[in-house]
Amino acid sequence: MAPSQHPKSAAAPATTSDQMSTASSRPTNGTAHTSAETAYPSSMTDSKPTQSGPGSRASDEQDADEAYSNHSEQHMDHSNPDGHPSKPSGRKKKKKAKKGRAGSQTLGDESSTPLSTPSVSMSHPLPPPLPPHLGTRTILKSAKDRSIWNTSTQEERENIKTFWLELGEEERRQLVKVEKDAVLKKMKEQQKHSCSCTVCGRKRTAIEEELEVLYDAYYEELEQYANNNQGSFEKGSPIVPPPRLYQPPLRSPGQHTRTQGQFHPSRGRIHEITEDEEDLEEDYDDEEEDDDEPYSDDEFEDEETRAARADFFAFGNSLTVKDGILTVADDLLKNDGKHFIDMMEQLAERRMQREEDTQYNIAAAHQSLHSGHNHPPYDEEDYDDEEDEEYDSQEEDDYDEDEMDTMTEEQRMEEGRRMFQIFAARMFEQRVLTAYREKVAEQRQQKLIEELMEEQTRTEQKNAKKAREAEKRKEKKRLQKQAKEEEKARREAEKAAEEAAAKAEQEKKLEEQRRKREEQRKKREAERKAQEEERARKEAEKQRRLREERERQAEAERKHREQKEQEKKKREEARRKEREERELREKKAKEERERKAQEDQKKANQETPETKRTSHLGPVPIPANLQPQGSSSHLQSPHLQSASPAVPKAPTPAKARQPSQQGSHGSSPRSQQASTEPFHTSISPRSMAPSQSSGASSVASKQGYGQQPMLHHPQPSTPLSPLGSVNRSLPPGFASAGLPSNPPGLPGMVPRPPIGHELPTYPPHSGPLMNQLRGFPAPNGIPIPPGINGTRPLAPGRGFPLEAAPGLPFHTQQPIAGAFASHQGGMSHGHSRQPSGSFERSPLEPHAQPFPISRPSPIKRPPSTQQEQSDANRATQRDVDNLSAQLGSSALLDDTDIPFTSNLSQSLPGATAPGSLPGPTRASFGAPSLFPDPLASKPGGFPMGPGVGANTWGTQIPFVSSAFPGAPAWGTAHGSGWSNNAFGSGGHHRAHTSRPVAIRLLVIQACKQLDTMSSSKAGSGYHDVKIVLQQVEQLRPSNEPSIPLKEMLDICDTEGNTQNGGGSFSIKKDETGEFVKFEPDNNSAASGHRGSIVPGEIGSPVPSSSMPAFGGIGNTPSVLRQFSSPTGF
C-alpha cells in the first residue's frame, strides 16, 4: 500500500500549487515553512484521512475537484482582468510551467517510484506543509481576498450556503436550465459544420438526449441536496473515482528541459474536502482571484529550477482521464467546446453501438473513440496540449493492453456520466457563486447609495445651518450699515443746505459780472463792425478803381490792336494787289519767253537736220505737239542713231550776269529765288578735253546695247558758269509725249518742274550703275523705287543742280525734247563776291560723259538778247525788294501781331515766287519733302513743266543738310508721276492731331464764324451750344464720326495751349438754355491776323496747287497751319 499512497500524498501540494500558481513572488531561500492553516480553513487541513472507495464521498469530491480545477484554470487562462480573451497557447503554457515548478518541490525522492492503479480502499494522508516560497504570498493574497469579497471566512461560506437554501425551486431550476441551455447551444453551434449524413444526425440526436438525461439527473441530486441539507451533491450511488488506466512512470528531471511546450499542468487537484459545496466554491474563488494577475515572477526562474520541478507534470498526466472528460470545462470556457463535443459524440457512439451490436470487444470500442465517421481532425490550436502530450506519453510508455481490456463498456459509460456530473456541478457552482456575488453587490450598492444619501443629507443640513448663520450675520451687518447711512445722510443734508446758500450768493455775484462783460462786449462789437464797414467800403472803392483802370487799359489795347489790324489789312491788301500785278506781268513774260523758245526751237530743228549725227548734244525741250512719237523697250546706245527724227539746236552761251546785284537782297527770305534767274546754257563739245573724249569713246565702244555708261570718270576742273538756261517747257497741264504727268486716281495735282529743279547743297550717297538720275527707269522698263539707286555724288560744298543729259534717253520711250531740256537751277548764294571766271561743270553733268569726237555744230544766234534778260531781271528784283521790306525782320518786331509762343509758320507764310510752285508748309500732308521749310523758296525761273519720263515713283531729290536755305530735303520733282509722299503733293494741311484737339479747333472756328455772322446775346459773344454744334458738324469732314454735344462740352472745359488753339471757353446756363463763348489769348488763332490766311494773300498757296489730304478732321488750312508741329533746324 505504500506505493499507492504516493499519488494521494502528492495531491494536496498539487492543489495548493495550482491555487497559488499566479502569485507574483520569487523563490526565497530560508523562508520557514508555513502550515496549511494560514491558507485553508481548519476544516480542510485538520481532517483525518478518510476511507476512499466506491462509495466514499471523499473520492467523489477529489474527482470533482479535479474537474473544477481544470475549469477554473482554463477560465482564468483565457480571461484577462480586463475581460478580453488572451492568446490560448502562451498563457496556458506559462501556467503549466509554473504549476510544474510549484509541484515538483513536494515530490522529493518519491518521484522515482512508479505509480500504480489505486485500490478501492485508498486512504488520504495529511497534506504536507506549503512550499517555502509560497507562504508569504498566500497570506497577502488571502488578506486581499478578504478585503474584496471576504469568501475565505466561515461566515461567508455560511452566507453562500444560506443563499442557496433560500432560493426557491423555480430559481434553482432556472440556474440549471440556463446551464443546460448554454451547453446545448454550444453543442449545436459546433455541430453546424459537421456533415449531414444519417449517422451524424443520429449522433447529434443521441448527444442531445444524453445531455437531457445528465442534466435531469443532476438537478434531481441538487434537489435532494437542498432538501436534505447534505454536504454532497448526490444521494444515490456515489461517483466512482476515475480509474487510472494509463500511468506512465515518473520521469527524471533531466528529461524535462523544455517543460513549457512538452508538458501540461495537472488537470486534477485531489485534496480532501470535509465541508460541503461552499468549500469548493471558496477554492474556486481563491483561484479565480489569484489568477487575475496577468504575469508571475516565477516565469523568470532559471532553467535548472524549471527542470527540477518538471517531473510533477508526469503526475498531472496520470490524473487525466483517457477520454478527455476533464477538459470539457476548458473547451467550454474557450468558447470552443470541441473536446466536450468529442466526448459527447463518443458517448453517443457508445450508446448507438450498445443498441446495434453488444458483441463489440473493448478494443473495437476503444478504436471507435478515435475514428468516428471520418471527421476531419480538430485544429491544432483547438486541441489542448495535454491531450497531445498525454496520448504521446501513453503511446511512448508502452501502455498495458491487458489493463485497458479490464474495463468494461458499462464502466466507461458510467465513468463518463460521473465526470459530466462533476463538471456540471463545478459549472453550476460558478453560477451560484456569481448569483450570490451579484446579490451581495446589489446589497452593497444599495447600502452605498444609502450611505451616500445620508452623507448628502448631512452635508445639506450642515450647509443649511451655515447659510442660516451667514444670513443672521448679514442681517446684523445690514442693520448696522443702515444706521450708519442714515447718520451720514443727515450730515450730508445739513452740509448741502449750507452749500446751497453759499452757492446762491456766488451765483448772484457771477450774474452781475456776466452782465457787465456782455455790455462791454456789445460795445466792442459795434466799434469793430463800424471799422469793418469802413474797410469794406474802402476795399470796394479800390477794386472799382482797379477794375475801371483795367477796363481803360483793355479798351486802349483793343483800339491799338484794331488799329494795327487795320494797318496790317491795308498792307496785306497792297501786297495782294502788288502780287497780282506781279503775277500778271510774270505770266505775260513767261508766255513771251515760251513763245520765243518755241520759235527758236522750230528754227533750230529746221536749219540743222544733219547736225545731230555728229554733235552728240542733248535735245532741247520742245512742245508736246511737235514731239515725234515712238516707242522703245530698251535703252539706246550712247552712239546716236543716224536716223534720228529730230535734231535739236545747240543752245548758245550768253554772257553771265554779275552777281553783285544780289547782295542787297540777302536778308530777304525770297532773295535766293529772285536773284537766281535762269539763263540758257550752251555747252559745246569743244569744251571737253580730248583725252577725256577719246578715253571715254573706247570705254563706250565696249558697252553692251542698252547699258548706261559709267559716270564716275574724272571731270574737267573748269568752274561751272552761273548762267541759267532759258525756260523751255510746255505750258502747265500738258503731258510730255502723251504720258500722264500725275498718277492715276490722283487728279488735280500740279506736276513739278523737271529734274534739276531743286537740288541740295550737299550730295547724297552714290548709287549703283543704273538709275543714276532719279526719274529715269531701268533698262527693262520697270521703274526703280526711290532710295535704291542714287545720283552720283556732287562735289562737297557745291550747290549746283543736275542738268538733263542732252541726247541720252534713259527711258524706254522715244527721246523727248521737252523733257530733256537743259535747265540751270538756282544756286544758294552765301555771299556777293564775284565768282571765278573758270568754267567748272557739275560732277553729275551729263555732258561730261565721253562721246566720240565729231564735227561740231555751227554756232547760231542766241534766242534772246542781254538787254531783254536784264529788263526782266530788274522787274523781278523790284518785286523781291518790296516783299523783303515788308516780310523781313521787321515783321518779327510786333509783339501784338505774332505771339511769342507761335511757330515760325504762323509769322512767315511762304510766298509763291513767279514761275514756280509754292512750297508746302510744315503741316502739309502732301509735301513731297521730309523736312519742308516755309522760309525757304523754290529755285525760281522754272516753268510749270510736265514730268520727266514715265517713272511712277517720281524723281528723287537728294537730301539737304540745312532746313533754311535749300529746297525740300528728300522730296521728288513734280510731274514725275508718283510722289514719294503717299498722300501726294498738295497745299497746306495739318499734321496728325488727336480727336479732342481737332474738335476743339473746330469749335474755335465755329465760334469765330458765329461771331461774324450773328450778334446773339447783345454782342456778348455767347452762342447757343446747339447752334455751335451744328456749325461744328458742318465743318467736320464727312469721313469722321459725328460729335455729340456732351463730348463737345467736355472738350470746351480743357485749357488752351499752342497745340489746341489756345484761349478758353466760358459756359453759362440760364432758363433759356446753355451758351458758350470763346475768349482768345496770345496762343489762340484770334490773336493775330496771320492765323487765317485766305487765298490771294501774301504767303497763301496758289489755289490750283492747294489740294486737301485724304483724311483727318478739318480741311482748314488757315487754322491748322499755324498750329503745326515745329520742325527741326
Curated annotation (Swiss-Prot):
InterPro entries: Fungal_stress_NST1 (IPR051195), NST1 (IPR025279). GO terms for cellular component: cytoplasm. Belongs to the NST1 family. It is found in: Cytoplasm. This is Stress response protein nst1. Pfam families: NST1. Residues 274-304, 379-408 have a biased composition (Acidic residues). Residues 72-85, 453-473, 482-613 have a biased composition (Basic and acidic residues). Residues 441-608 form a coiled coil. Residues 1-136, 229-307, 361-413, 453-879, 903-937 are annotated as: Disordered. May act as a negative regulator of salt tolerance.
